[in-house]
Amino acid sequence: MAIVNHTLGFPRVGLRRELKKAQESYWAGNATQEELLTVGRELRARHWQQQKDAGVDLLPVGDFAWYDHVLTTSLLLGNVPARHQNEDGSVDLDTLFRIGRGRAPTGQPAAAAEMTKWFNTNYHYMVPEFTKGQQFKLTWTQLLDEVDEALALGHKVKPVLLGPVTYLWLGKVKGEQFDRLSLLQDILPVYQQVLAELTKRGIEWVQIDEPALALELSQEWLAAFKPAYDALQGQVKLLLTTYFDSVSQNLETIKALPVQGLHIDLVHGKDDAATLSAQLPANWVLSLGVINGRNVWRADLSNWFERLQPLVGTRDLWLGSSCSLLHSPIDLSVEVRLDDEVKSWFAFAIQKCAELSLLSQALNSGNGQALEAYSAPIRARRTSTRVNNVAVAQRLAAITAQDSQRQNVYSVRADAQRERFNLPAWPTTTIGSFPQTTEIRGLRLDFKQGRLDGNNYRTGIAEHIKQAVAEQERLGLDVLVHGEAERNDMVEYFGEHLDGFVFTQNGWVQSYGSRCVKPPVIIGDVSRPEAITVEWAKYAQSLTDKPMKGMLTGPVTILCWSFPREDVTRETIAKQIALALRDEVADLEAAGIGIIQIDEPALREGLPLHRSDWDAYLAWAVDAFRLNAAVAKDDTQIHTHMCYCEFNDIMDSIAALDADVITIETSRSDMELLESFEEFEYPNEIGPGVYDIHSPNVPSVEWMEALLKKAAQRIPAERLWVNPDCGLKTRGWPETRQALANMVQAAQRLRETQ
């Protein structure tokens, strides 16, 4: 019973983001479809070979996607929204891109599929749409074609298929409401057909992903698994694959399924491998996800060897990544700017494959000696001065409950703020960023690469800030922002100015479609060596008599959008960041900045998958925000901004943030999100976004006025602000000017009618 190792998936984009560049070139009409397809074939061949060379026994096929793997599954099943369908019902690569990007077959705009986070990761998937009486059929053979490719190259492969129950769980009903689980019987024949085709190709194992089993599912959803897998049994062997959390809460359901193996995530789950193994059918393969697919840290293989050795020989064991390596950068070896000490702490996708090979070899031989040397750097890290900062630890230990409390309650603060700012009814503002022009990006790049000295860089940034302030004054906005010309990214910018962070050159991971992000890595205790935003906020305030907002990214968002440490809790990291940013709030206040916005768009994203764990997370997440903000005096107005949020199930926590003003994304939901605030009787001020900044469309004055009137039916007008949905970084100036002018006019009309 030799241990087999495998990965659940591999990054798609390529070391140099080749897929992104090929996609965007094709979309722009600068490359043919065949050229795009060639890039895909080359990437798949390279990635299979890289995994094989690193010692992976069983290679995943079907993890590659032209846009998103859930969207690929939709096409496999023939699930194409009517607005994106070809007249003849055919499905091709352009169909896939139309769904992801928002086009009709005629080339006219048509709403893209909704996009949302893949469980609790920073990857986004395209939400499947379901309609009553919908038909499904095998229309997109990408998986089968890629299996043929891999077999032709001589690889031993394991096709990857998103499971039917999770697929339905991920989707949304459109039009007439019905139970989407009723579609299960309609999609199973397509799954049967795919498995039959794989059987014909001599495939032994199929990895069938059901990450929904890591959730606390209702009985209705749990009951769907048995009939689904009864229908799928009897062809190839099925490895039921779960990840992102433990599955013990659903173990009775899992044990009854006619599958041949189970994969569990031992990195993020709380399951004990030996306990779980004893409860599973003896003839099942148990695949243990021991290498973290969602982070960049080198594994302590010696520790895993000690934990897993008692299981060897008790049953068929596989070793795998905790989840797909999609969420990890590709290759550490190209990171030439990281110093040797820090680099020795990391492992990217290729290195993680090698870790699987090392660990499986050691367990198969019964000799873990080779793992000691490999694990030494991660163990030495524990005492590194790069990691441990005594002053941070002392400050963290000294936190009291009072540190998270503003001086007075909101009603008292609101009076002080009204007296200080004397704002009109329906005050207008923006969320923070203004268009990042080619000139601004070029200025930052020239400075970063040494072609521009510091003085000339600051002169250039100051000019862009001056222009942004002048634009806002011309438009008649009430509370201004400096526009963030100096910031490349809302998390990276702060990470670059805080101790405890490092940055990679090529640590790209896919966010969605062709969009890639390069998250910072939190390697040690976080502190602020000097003020970060004060210089530019103070300069911007000097240009106007109107209030100027200071702009900070909040502690939970910085944590969620970085690769975090694994040796301390997320709560500890969040509170370290909060203390650093607390000092920034105090310095902004001392510099005369009276309104400070602390953005927390990731607050909801950080929720654990198990609802039973929510309260503990929300308690420390809210406390981190309050710790960050509570140093402010009564007449300093604290704003926060959240986007892509559903609030109704966390309203207590939103209110507990105790921000004076919260701005939220509501235009796309036609103000429906405000229902949560109305029902809860949210006590503080709210700025419901009145137009969607993700679209170049310019909303009319009448449209925004109507939305604001709708908002005033739910929230008292004296507590309403007027603002866009989100920052304007990705927009151009022409539509920004026009949209904001209309927004200001809508607010003025409402003032006149009050």
From Swiss-Prot:
Binds 1 zinc ion per subunit. L-methionine binds at residues 431-433, 484, 599. Pfam families: Meth_synt_1 (PF08267), Meth_synt_2 (PF01717). Zn(2+) binds at residues 641, 643, 665, 726. InterPro entries: Cbl-indep_Met_Synth_N (IPR013215), Cobalamin-indep_Met_synthase (IPR006276), Met_Synth_C/arc (IPR002629), UROD/MetE-like_sf (IPR038071). The active site is at 694 (proton donor). Keywords: Amino-acid biosynthesis, Metal-binding, Methionine biosynthesis, Methyltransferase, Repeat, Transferase, Zinc. Signal peptide: none annotated. 5-methyltetrahydropteroyltri-L-glutamate binds at residues 17-20, 117, 515-516, 561, 605. It catalyses: 5-methyltetrahydropteroyltri-L-glutamate + L-homocysteine = tetrahydropteroyltri-L-glutamate + L-methionine. Its cofactor is Zn(2+). PANTHER family: 5-METHYLTETRAHYDROPTEROYLTRIGLUTAMATE--HOMOCYSTEINE METHYLTRANSFERASE (PTHR30519). NCBIfam families: met_syn_B12ind (TIGR01371), PRK05222.1 (NF003556). This is 5-methyltetrahydropteroyltriglutamate--homocysteine methyltransferase.
